[in-house]
A protein has these predicted regions:
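Solvent-exposed, flexible loop/coil segments flanking beta-strands in beta-rich domains
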Residues: 142, 197-213, 316-334
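Sequence/fold signature of self-assembling virion shell proteins
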Residues: 2-57, 80, 151-159, 165, ...
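Disordered, low-complexity "stalk" and linker segments at domain junctions of extracellular
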Residues: 289-413
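Short amphipathic alpha-helical coiled-coil/interface segments
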Residues: 163-171
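A short small-residue
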Residues: 141-154
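Assembly/oligomerization interface modules of large self-assembling protein complexes
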Residues: 40, 44, 48-144, 164
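Structured segments of extracytoplasmic/periplasmic soluble domains
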Residues: 170-178, 223-226, 230
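Short, glycine/acidic-rich hinge or "gate" loops at secondary-structure transitions
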Residues: 176-192
């Protein structure tokens, strides 16, 4: 977790008075509104470092013999555990939803003033708007937390703690994934930031940078400039990059000012907390892995609009930890007419949430430069209740339009991504939540829901109600195929 000061402003971190915990655990950071900076102090030592376990045990003791422990008693402790486990959520604002369907407008261009009498076209004064609906998604976590029995057994307390910790961990990962990569081509997923930016790219207003090289400060500056051109220079923002990438960026700084408090040793492996006064969040879920399956292809002269050419295909898995390196590409497919299609098959990846399908047109496939994104598809099939019924293992390209700026991440060059996310409430990436099954506003974004009540137990479920909203795609930027060396 990095510094949370954003351009010297009292961010939502201060507004919500949340304390940010450093993953290194030996330093505790908190935002000080009066000083407009982040203060660091040694973390208080506790006998048991599992704070959730301590709190659950305390709640059990408080319940007393002969009394029941209600799930609602643990809700504040679970919320603290969620934000401690999932730092990204502390930066993303949650807006109160008022209905199950939300309407919004996405701006693709911005009206600009022009002088009267100029001969140039005034088309820059017009704006294009796309109206869409965001259906609020309901996610049920893991899927049930065990019944809250009478507080008499230590073994029950240990089992309860383990289940609660696992449920919090799972919901945290799911929310991180949903904010960045989720794609609503799958009925049971929300729309993540990657989908917003890639849809924007098809409209030729893209903030996707295909770097294809070692990270430089110029790249970060270009991302900042692209966002600032959209007039978001004063907004709260956040860098997302891997730990190794953050360390590499730190070595590119030619001058660093370090304030050492009395008794604080100098740290040899110095990592910059911010770049351009924007905090850097070290996130391992933007570090790709080699989990994507190989793809086989079969060409047909009918069923599509593919023209006469040679074609190659590859797919990459998107799982709960983000986009992975692309798998082994298909052999060369040949289409001789103008109505061709290509059917793809692969062995399903049980951990996949989505597949990203890439296509190359040409006689040979040399590098990932040749592959371009043509489609994002669901990785699973479901029944009417949302239960997984199978894995998706096929796709047919009938002539989809490729996004020229989006190439797959290649393991041979150890590609990675860097995100610049606008977190300003109602303008940047925002979570919409707080609607129950009946469409009524509720006080929390996620909560423990009582399923049934029996003589000695209160079965509960962790549920979250949210959708993602990004009104202005150009308020964010992503750099793809960035390397440490």
């Amino acid at each position: 977790m990095s510094n949370v000061t954003v351009r010297g402003r009292d961010t939502f971190v201060a507004r919500n008075a949340r304390k940010l915990a450093d993953p290194r655990r030996h330093i505790q950071r908190a935002y000080d509104p009066s000083a407009r900076t982040v203060v660091e102090r040694p973390r208080e030592k506790v006998a048991d470092r599992n704070e959730l376990a301590l709190r659950v045990k305390a709640a059990l003791d408080t319940a007393g013999t002969g009394s029941y422990l209600l799930g609602y008693d643990l809700y504040p402790e679970l919320v603290d555990a969620l934000y401690d486990r999932t730092p990204l959520l502390q930066f993303i604002e949650t807006a109160q939803a008022t209905s199950k369907v939300h309407e919004y407008r996405t701006r693709l261009t911005y009206p600009r003033p022009v002088f009267q009498g100029e001969g140039a076209s005034a088309s820059s004064t017009s704006g294009t708007y796309g109206t869409g609906n965001v259906t609020l998604k309901i996610a049920r976590g893991y899927p049930e937390v065990t019944g809250f029995l009478e507080a008499t057994s230590k073994s029950f307390a240990d089992a309860l703690i383990e289940e609660l910790a696992g449920a919090v961990h799972g919901i945290g990962e799911f929310m991180e994934y949903s904010l960045l990569w989720a794609n609503d081509v799958d009925t049971y997923q929300v729309k993540g930031l990657a989908e917003w930016l890639e849809a924007d790219a098809t409209a030729k207003v893209s903030n996707i940078f295909d770097h294809d090289g070692t990270v430089t400060l110029t790249l970060l500056d270009n991302m900042l400039n692209a966002v600032k051109l959209a007039s978001w220079s004063g907004d709260a923002m956040l860098w997302l990059m891997s730990t190794s990438m953050a360390q590499k960026v730190s070595t590119l700084q030619t001058r660093a000012n370090i304030q050492l408090s009395p008794g604080q040793p100098f740290e040899g492996a110095m990592v910059m907390n911010t770049y351009g006064n924007i905090p850097i969040l070290e996130a391992d879920y933007v570090t790709p892995r080699t989990t994507s399956p190989a793809v086989s292809a079969s060409a047909s002269e009918s069923g599509g609009t593919l023209g006469a050419a040679y074609y190659y295909y590859a797919i990459s898995t998107v799982d709960i930890e983000g986009e992975q390196f692309h798998g082994t590409a298909s052999s060369r497919m040949t289409i001789s007419g103008s109505t061709g299609s290509v059917a793809l098959t692969w062995t399903g990846d049980a951990s996949a949430q989505l597949y990203r399908v890439y296509r190359s047109v040409g006689d040979t496939l040399n590098t990932a430069d040749d592959l371009k994104l043509i489609k994002v598809i669901a990785a699973k099939t479901y029944d009417g209740s949302g239960n997984v019924t199978g894995l998706v293992e096929s796709f047919t390209d009938t002539g989809y339009t490729a996004i020229s700026t989006v190439h797959p991440l290649a393991s041979a060059s150890n590609d990675s991504t860097i995100w610049l996310v606008n977190t300003e409430a109602d303008r940047g990436l925002t979570m919409l939540g707080n609607i129950d099954d009946d469409g009524r506003p509720i006080a929390e974004m996620w909560r423990l829901v009582e399923l049934a009540r029996t003589k000695d137990s209160f079965p509960m479920m962790l549920k979250i109600y949210f959708a993602n909203l990004a009104k202005y795609p150009t308020a964010h930027a992503i750099a793809r195929r960035v390397r440490v060396s």
